[in-house]
């Protein structure tokens, strides 16, 4: 049973105990992502440079009071990583032993950055290389544009990594402003699942946060009222490639849905997409046999900014025909419901729950 605890400092904690697991999963979520460029800090408007959230993620993992957190966790036999999305930055660890100690290291390390010119320049180099590699990727621009056009109404958002010029211009004051503004208990969530002692966990969290001196900053994100409709009907990107790629995006407004209903929708969408667009689906086989697509249809479903965003995409040399088929498929509800396949998916889902092989993060995400 998922339990929510909110501390006096505003920190939200979600606990999903499961003593049948040997592993404990810990995720620190900061509500600061690639889109958070327009904010009010102590009543004054500020523009945060694009790419700051991602840059800060790297810095916090590599330069803090403990040193390089991923190296330290690796020496302790603990899996660890971090990533930045449109609306969040996340740091997670998976451990079997010394849960409380590892939790303390994660929380203390992330909140004790070492920020100076040398550190920033050391972080900057690899991120510039990461950005250049992303620009060389065949479909980076088209994937990015399709995603943004479907969900975001924000003028200053460029990409999670930012432009090369943004990365090159990041200074100490930019990092310090972002860290002090967003890395605070009332803007963070801690998710813990698996095997752990609840009382010990809560005590560690309280002790760590009590020892941190947070800046007295009042921050207000500039709220964007997203339209229920897509922002742009079509985005065309010209790149020097031999093979075209089409990405068709849909969004479902789930802002006012209850957490449990979001979880159920996520589960049903997984079945729906796999059954209708998977490798063995009738539609995929038909498009491959007719040489309309190269390879197979790819699909995804993500929860972003209160919307479930569905993407159906494929490499194709007959883009207009592929687009017409997919749009007609949705518009005229030509969906296939295979009861036998649905029951098989349901049985597999139940087996995952019984054997505890389900993805704890995917289970919890719609609930928080």
Where are these regions (language model features)?
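Short, flexible turn/loop "capping" segments at secondary-structure junctions
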Residues: 82-85, 158-159, 180-186, 239-242, ...
């Amino acid at each position: 049973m998922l339990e929510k605890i909110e501390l006096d400092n505003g920190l939200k904690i979600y606990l999903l105990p499961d003593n049948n697991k040997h592993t404990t999963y810990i995720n620190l979520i900061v509500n600061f992502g690639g889109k958070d460029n327009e904010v009010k800090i102590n009543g004054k408007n500020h523009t945060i440079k694009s790419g700051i959230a991602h840059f800060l993620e790297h810095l916090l993992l590599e330069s803090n009071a403990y040193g390089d957190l991923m190296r330290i966790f690796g020496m302790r036999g603990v899996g660890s990583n971090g990533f930045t999305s449109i609306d969040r930055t996340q740091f997670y660890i998976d451990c079997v032993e010394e849960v409380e100690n590892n939790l303390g290291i994660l929380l203390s390390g992330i909140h004790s950055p070492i920020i100076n010119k040398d550190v920033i320049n050391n972080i900057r180099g690899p991120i510039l290389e990461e950005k250049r590699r992303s620009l060389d990727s065949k479909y980076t621009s088209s994937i990015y544009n399709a995603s943004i056009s479907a969900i975001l109404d924000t003028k200053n958002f460029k990409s999670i990594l930012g432009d090369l010029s943004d990365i090159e211009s990041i200074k100490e004051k930019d990092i310090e402003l972002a860290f002090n503004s967003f890395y605070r208990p009332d803007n963070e969530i801690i998710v813990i699942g698996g095997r752990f002692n609840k009382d010990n966990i809560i005590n560690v969290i309280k002790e760590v946060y009590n020892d941190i001196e947070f800046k007295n900053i009042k921050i207000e994100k500039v709220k964007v009222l997203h339209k229920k409709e897509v922002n742009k009907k079509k985005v065309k990107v010209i790149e020097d490639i031999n093979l075209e790629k089409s990405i068709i995006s849909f969004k479902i407004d789930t802002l006012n849905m209850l957490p449990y209903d979001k979880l159920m929708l996520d589960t049903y969408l997984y079945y729906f997409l796999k059954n209708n667009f998977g490798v063995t689906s009738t539609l995929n086989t038909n498009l491959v046999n007719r040489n309309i697509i190269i390879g197979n249809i790819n699909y995804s479903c993500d929860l972003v900014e209160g919307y479930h965003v569905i993407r159906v995409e494929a490499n194709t040399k007959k883009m207009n025909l592929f687009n017409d088929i997919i749009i007609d498929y949705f518009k005229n509800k030509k969906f296939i419901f295979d009861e036998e396949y649905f029951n098989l998916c349901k049985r597999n889902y139940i087996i995952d729950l019984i054997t505890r092989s389900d993805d704890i993060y995917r289970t919890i995400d719609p609930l928080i």
